[in-house]
Amino acid sequence: MAKKRVVIGMSGGVDSSVSAWLLKEQGYEVIGLFMKNWEDDDDSEYCSTRQDWIDAASVADVVGVDIEAVNFASEYKDRVFAEFLREYQAGRTPNPDVLCNAEIKFKAFLDHAMLLGADMIATGHYARVREVTSGPDAGRVELLKAVDASKDQSYFLHRLNQAQLAKTLFPLGEIRKTEVRKIAEQLKLPNATKKDSTGICFIGERPFREFLNRYLSYQPGPMKTPEGVIVGEHVGLSFYTLGQRKGIGLGGMKSHKNTDGNSEPWYVARKDVATNTLYIVQGHDHPWLLSSELSAGQMSWVAGSPPSEELVSAKTRYRQADVACSQRSDADGFSLAFAAPQWAVTPGQSAVLYQGDVCLGGGIINTSAVPA
C-alpha cells in the first residue's frame, strides 16, 4: 500500500521541524512547504525570512524530506493584512493569527498542498483533532486543546471548518514542549535552540507603533478620565488597547492613592472613535475595566452550527484560563454572560468557546458591558 502523502508547513522553527520528523517516523511520505507571506521590507533588520528558509531547508536535509517554498504574500495582504489595518483604523484590536490560520495556513496552504497530491496537511501547532466515531455526530471532526495546556493553540484555530480539520494532522498535540526541545536536541537539528517566534503573524517582531505608522492615518486627541477630566493627549487611538498600562505617558501623574500610599497606575479603559477620545482609569480593578457580558459577531463554529449547550466556558484572550459563562447565539452572532466579571474584554479580539477540551468555535468581540 502506498504511503499517505503529508505536506507539512515548515517555518524554520523547532515545532514544525520536530513535527516533520515525527510524521516520517510514523510512516508518512512527508513534503515540507515553506511559506513566504510578507515582502514589504525584505531587506529590513526585522525580516527573518531568509534565515527561516535556511533553517527549514537545513532541517529538511537532516530529517530526510523534500522541501519547497511557496509565496502567499499577495493572499496574505488581501485576506489578512488588509482586515488587520481596517480593524485598527476602526479603533479595535484585531488578532491577525486567527485570520492568518483560517485564510493562509489552512486555506491557501491546503489548496496548494492538494496540487502537490497531498492526502493530508500538517503544522506544528499545539492542538488535537478527533473524529467522532459513534452517535448522531459520527463522522464529525472535533478540535481539541493540546495535552500541553501551557502551549495550547486551539484559541487561534477556532475558525477552522470541518473540511479543513478533516485534512489536518497536529503531530504535537499529545506532546509537551519540553519533549519537543529534547527531540530536536537528540536529532541535532540545526535550529534546536532557536527561540519561538513572536510578533505579528508572518511579519514578526518589530516596534509596533513605528510599523503601524507606515500604513494608518492617525490623529492625536484628548485622554480623559470617566469624569470627563482631560489629563493628557493620545497619539492616535490605533496605538492603544484596552487594559494597556505601559506607554500611556502618564506615569508621573498622581491623583489616586492605594492604602499603602502608592499611586495606582493608569489603564486604557475605552476608545471613543466618534470623538477621538481615549478614556483612562486608575487601578487594575476599576469598574470600567470589568465586563459581565459581551456580544460577538463574525462567528465560526467548528461543527458548522452553533453549540446547543447554554453553559460553556470561554477565553477572551490567548493564555487566559477558561471562564464559566452562558451563551446565546442567533444568525447575527452570540452573547456571553460571565459567572464572574472579566477584565479588559477587548473589541476586535476573539471570544472562543469550549466544552471541556473541545473547542466549539467563536467570534469577534463587538461590545462588552460593565457589571450592573
Curated annotation (Swiss-Prot):
Site feature (Interaction with tRNA) residues: H125, Q349
Name of the encoding gene: mnmA
Sequence positions that bind ATP: G9, M10, S11, G12, G13, V14, D15, S16, M35, G124
Pfam families in UniProt: tRNA_Me_trans, tRNA_Me_trans_C, tRNA_Me_trans_M
Region ranges (Interaction with tRNA): 151-153, 317-318
Protein name, UniProt field: tRNA-specific 2-thiouridylase MnmA
Source organism per UniProt: Janthinobacterium sp. (strain Marseille) (Minibacterium massiliensis)
Gene Ontology MF: a single term: tRNA binding
Disulfide bonds: C100-C201
